[in-house]
Every structure is written in C-alpha cells, then in structure tokens.
A protein has these predicted regions:
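Flexible, glycine-rich surface segments
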Residues: 234-315
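Bacterial Sec-exported substrate-binding components of ABC uptake systems
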Residues: 22-105, 216-243, 367-378
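Proline-aspartate-enriched helix->loop->beta-strand connector
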Residues: 152-168, 184, 291-304
Length: 378
C-alpha cells in the first residue's frame, strides 16, 4: 500500500519525534533524530508535487495525486533508518537515467543535466531538441524502448539509476512493475496535470532538487517569471484567438478553457474563444468538436493558431482550407492572421514564456517577424 505524505510523516516513531524550529501553530512535517525537518520548499504555482527539506540535505519529494514519496539523499549522507517501504530512496548523484517523458528533457538541459541521462524512450529522429538528438546520434544516449516496451536488457546493462515516465505508463502498468522488480526506481512525473504554464515551468525546481542544482533551478525560474512581468502591466488587446487542429476524421481538436495553452493566450493579452469549454468528465486538456460547432465559436476570431503537433505543419492557406473548406469563411483566414506552431514547441518546456511573448507580438503587431514558435501561414 502506498502511503500519502501525511501518512508517512505520522508513521515515524512517536518516541523520537522532535520539533525543528516550528511554532505550535504551524503545520509542519514531524521530525526524527535522523530526519529533522527544516523547511518546505516554497512553490508559487505548482500543485502536483511538494518538497520538504530536512537537515543534512535530505529532501522528500511527494507527488500529490499518487502520494508517491521519493527521499533525495546527498551522496555522502547517512542512510535513514525506519523509512516506510513506500518511500523510494534516490541517492545522488543519480546517474544513467532512462528518460521517457519527453517534456522533462528541456528542463534537464536548462539545468545542465544532460549527462545524467544515458537512456531515452524516444528515438533520435523523434527529438526536436538539438542537444538531445545530437547526444543520441553521438552514442552518449541510447534508445531503450518506448514506455510500453522497455528494453530491459539494455536498461539493466546500463546500471540505470532511475526511470522517469509520464502517466502514459499507467496504460501498461506491467512495464512499470517489471522495472521495479528489477530494482529500478520509477518516477511518474505529472507536470502535464498542472493547469497553468508557470506551474508547469516550476517543475524546474523538482528536477533541480533531484539533480542537486536547486539554486540554478530557483534562479532560472525567477528569471522566466520576471520576463513576463511587463505583460501584467498592459491592458488586454481584445484580440479573439482560437488554438486548434483538424483531425483525420473531420473534427476540430481544441483546448478546454482551463488548459495551460488557453491561459497563455490570456496572459499574452488575448481572449480564448473557447474559454467556456469545461471538463467533460475526463482529465484530457483537449476535446473534439464537430466542425459546425467549431465554426460557430471561431469564425469571427481575429487570430487562428494551428497546432502542428499531431496533424503536422500547415504552410499555406490552401493546405489549411484543404483540411476543412469551412475555414475559407473565417475572419482570420480572410485577413491573413493564421499562424502555425513549430513542431518543437511541445518538447521545449522551457519555452512557455517565449511562446507567450510570441503571442503578444501577434496580438499587437501588424506582421511580426522572427517569432520563435509561430510561423505565418501564407
């Protein structure tokens, strides 16, 4: 049985509990003589993890939804006795990581942590991050199978210290269980379940703790937040915007109103046309609309953003209209205000602020050039 963070803390022996500089009115994790609570890592946006810091450099990372616990332990620190079996101990430095969750790679790059990854769940040609692709082509990172079919022999031979998965692994739980039977810790990261872009970006602190680069993570996160500060002082542009793609079965795939892409449109000063679309009983951030409903909601949008991730890049208006003839009647198509995301966008987790700044230029400039993640559909 998995223990929650609260259950873990309650399970520590009462005979050795100590208070570590906290007043009686504060709610803080209990401490033991071997694991003495110091402080909780402050998080401004993220809700899918917590980090409790203990004396001696120990940090307990908790995945809030699953309740999974990971005790990050400094290289030369003593082993903590009496931990519940549900706590996974990760002793630094964590080497030979099997990285399956592609959104994590860009955060590792920002922390200069690429050398800790030696196994990938994505082939070289599947990476849009130049450094990751180059590392695979040079043989510094090897392909070790996708999430549902790990190459156990290769993973074991590499002396893998940690497998980093996303929640897709829950579709094939036997793969996760087999890795754990081989003694390989499995961490299922949940950054994609954060509702906002800055909450996703704040996972930089999670990986900074894991890699022993907390200060760098704090500095980089603060720098990214600061870059957005000028936009908060500006009035909304009034530009209405849709973010979509046309599926193979003639539906419009759009983001729900609470999704982080919708929030980025708002942060950039725009109005997301499907802001009222809410959760329809699943945890997906997208939903498919009949073309008639999409037409009704987005026909008068000032800006159209085409999502290239699944259905591919659209270069021209002719290509776009070939996917859906109704689009020829859209205001943004007729005015030439249609943009397509680059295919690298969803792997570049550190680029969320850049994307917001790109959007702001689209909303405020007549014909912005040299955007990082948007290309004009001519």
């Amino acid at each position: 049985m998995k223990l929650t963070r609260q259950q873990f803390l309650k399970a520590l022996p009462a005979s050795v509990l100590l208070l570590a500089g906290c007043s009686a009115s504060e709610t803080a994790p209990a401490s033991t003589e071997e694991l003495v609570f110091d402080h909780a890592c402050p998080l401004d946006y993220a809700t899918q993890f917590t980090a409790d810091c203990y004396e001696g450099g120990y940090t307990m990372l908790t995945l809030t939804d699953s309740g999974e616990l990971f005790l990050v332990t400094p290289e030369d620190a003593a082993e903590v006795e009496g931990l519940p079996e549900s706590v996974t101990v990760l002793r630094q430095p964590i080497r030979n990581i099997y990285l399956v969750s592609t959104s994590v790679m860009d955060l590792f790059l920002a922390l200069d942590g690429l050398d800790s990854v030696t196994l990938s769940g994505t082939r070289a040609e599947g990476w849009y991050l130049d450094e990751a692709r180059a590392a695979m082509e040079a043989g510094r990172i090897a392909y070790a199978g996708k999430y549902s079919a790990p190459d156990y022999e290769k993973i074991l031979a590499a002396n893998c210290g940690l497998a980093i998965e996303n929640t897709m692994i829950y579709h094939t739980p036997e793969a996760k269980e087999q890795l754990e039977r081989f003694g390989i810790p499995v961490l299922v990261e949940r950054s994609s379940y954060e509702s906002g872009p800055l909450a996703r970006l704040e996972w930089l602190k999670f990986w900074g703790i894991l890699l022993g680069k907390e200060e760098l993570a704090e500095q980089e996160f603060a720098r990214q937040v600061e870059r957005l500060a000028p936009l908060a002082e500006q009035a909304p542009t009034g530009k209405r915007c849709a973010f979509f793609s046309i599926t193979a079965n003639n539906l419009a795939n759009v983001r729900k109103g609470g999704d982080y892409v919708a929030q980025m449109i708002e942060m950039a000063g725009g109005d997301y046309v499907f802001a009222d679309l809410t959760d329809n009983g699943n945890n997906l951030s997208t939903m498919n609309l009949p073309l008639e409903d999409f037409y009704a909601g987005a026909k008068d949008a000032d800006v159209l953003l085409y999502n290239s991730t699944i259905e591919g890049v659209v270069h021209t208006t002719e290509e776009l209209v070939a996917k859906c003839s109704l689009l020829a009647e859209f205001k943004a198509v007729q005015s030439g205000s249609v943009w397509c995301t680059t295919q690298s966008f969803f792997q570049q987790s550190m680029a969320l602020v850049d994307f917001v700044l790109d959007l702001h230029r689209v909303f405020t400039e007549d014909d912005p050039a040299d955007l990082q993640f948007l290309r004009k559909v001519e």
